[in-house]
Amino acid sequence: MADYGAQLLWLRGEQDFLGNRYSRRHMLRFDGGVEIAASSSPHVVPVPMSDPAAVDPEEAFVAALASCHLLWFLSIAARRKFCVDSYADSPLGVMARNSEGKLAMTVVTLRPQVAFSGSRLPTPAEVVEMHHQAHAECFIANSVKTEVRCEPVFAAGTADSSTDD
């Protein structure tokens, strides 16, 4: 078992807190020293009280799911002796009412595009299986109720990459 944490800091300064006219911008700090500007989403709290240039919790949630999946996929591919040259994804989360009628991130769709090289290339079926296994192992996906879909995009770098699955 391991513990994971972060630090958050928000300061009111001279802002009109009681009048609900305060910035939602804050800082996230992680154990390696990385600091990221964070804010509420402008879809939830209008600008200028939110900062569209900062990471919002919804984006961070989608990114955490995609990052966890990526790391598991790379590990699985390496164990299976498939050389991954690149992995790109543009995950998309959908905020909607869940079965309890509450706003929630109800679906996150990953669209990974992986390029391989070497004499041993995975078939599209093997790529799909590695994505399935990565999803099953992902700590973040195993921690949430959100439906997480994986729709791999095939390009050059898989055996028989012209095959549609």
PLM regions: where:
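Extended beta-strand/beta-hairpin segments
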Residues: 1-63, 71-165
